A protein has these predicted regions:
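Carbohydrate transferase catalytic cores enriched for Leloir-type hexosyltransferases
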Residues: 1-359
Length: 359
């Protein structure tokens, strides 16, 4: 029986894009190949809530060291030597340098090498001495967009033809909710009837600071979803509404209820927040950088990442033009329907089969 270990150590809420990717594959690949054994690798603290649903379906085993900790590499090698899989899928940039077995690695982007603000000596050394050499010896490599294929190829010296592009998906739970749900959400969260949503984090490349000079002059309040303390860290004043991390059900309502969803990140390997917002009918304004042009296409407004006035003008257009909002909402839903986690899982399983010499 073929045994495949899938790395799930980064799945701990609130889910960022890479964690959601790993979780969705672990949900969807095993039923496609019932004759294989799939095992999920989790951290030393055991099974987080987000993985509880998987426990009855696939075994979850612990790695004795934290994700990206100093002891991670020997602990990861020990866990894999104990499991003896035919294949290990490294679903993030944490690859097993001390385990020589068959590897499939997903390299989502190269931001720690490409961006000055994300670069450090430690990260550069890790990517150049660990990630790059081990990835070049992998059985197969996956990335999530044509943008990322170019970035990973350039910064890790990997031939672009070795990187198969398999796009992320969007779960069916991200859908256009009824107005009654939106009214209830606004009431529970103390939100006005009309607002602009901005999503990201305080990381520099998420670029939420571009909205700081214009936030007070927007035609509707700005609601920030970027982690606790982000408002102060990014220099926004008290007029900005800050939300704590939302469960998926309320994230859907946050997207759907916004006059516009502002996603100013200038370096995204894929851009899952923009895709999920479109699936919920939220009109999207995204930076014209990274993978956003690939993912959003003509279904949203793409504006220069670093131009506050361009963001203000786009927001004003959405606020004033009902037809534009309706058009972008419909186009976004249609665009998002082209991205499926089931399709991602099926294509990834084909990568496994080829890596094992089965096709």
């Amino acid at each position: 029986m073929v045994k495949v270990v899938i790395d799930l150590r980064m799945v701990r809420g609130p889910l960022h894009g890479i964690a959601r990717y790993a979780l969705e594959l672990a949900r969807r690949i095993p039923p496609l190949e019932p004759g294989w054994q799939f095992v999920g690798l989790v951290g030393p603290d055991g099974v987080p809530d987000d993985l509880g649903e998987l426990a009855p379906r696939i075994p979850l085993v612990r790695c004795s060291a934290e994700f990206l900790s100093p002891l991670e590499q020997p602990a990861l090698a020990a866990a894999l030597l104990k499991q003896r899989p035919e294949l290990f899928h490294a679903t993030s940039f944490s690859v097993p340098a001390l385990w020589p077995g068959p590897l499939v690695a997903t390299l989502h982007d190269a931001n720690h090498l490409a961006l000055n603000e994300s670069r450090s000596r430690t990260r550069t050394a890790y990517y150049q001495l660990v990630v790059g050499p081990r990835a070049r010896r992998a059985k197969a490599l996956v990335t999530v967009s044509e943008f990322s294929r170019g970035e990973v190829s350039r910064h890790l010296s990997i031939a672009p033809e070795r990187l198969q592009v398999i796009a992320n998906g969007v779960d069916a739970s991200f859908r256009v909710p009824p107005e009654s749900e939106l009214e209830d959400f606004r009431a529970r969260r103390g939100l006005p009837a009309r607002y602009f949503g901005a999503i990201g984090s305080i990381k520099p490349h998420k670029n939420l600071g571009v909205l700081q000079p214009i936030a007070a002059s927007l035609p509707a309040p700005l609601v920030l979803l970027a982690g606790r303390g982000a408002r102060r860290a990014l220099g926004f004043d008290e007029s900005i509404i800050e939300l704590s991390p939302l469960p998926d059900a309320d994230l859907v309502r946050f997207y759907a209820g916004a006059v516009g969803v502002l996603v100013p990140s200038y370096y995204e390997g894929f851009g899952l927040p923009a895709l999920e917002a479109m699936a919920c009918g939220g009109p999207v304004v995204a930076a014209d950088a990274g993978a956003h042009p690939e993912v959003v296409g003509a279904a949203g407004l793409l504006v220069p990442a670093h131009d506050p006035q361009a963001w203000k003008i786009a927001a004003q257009r959405l606020f004033r033009d009902d037809d534009l909002r309706a058009s972008l909402s419909a186009a976004g839903v249609a665009r998002a329907a082209r991205f499926s986690w089931d399709d991602c899982a099926q294509k990834t399983l084909q990568v496994y089969r080829r890596a094992l010499g089965m096709s």
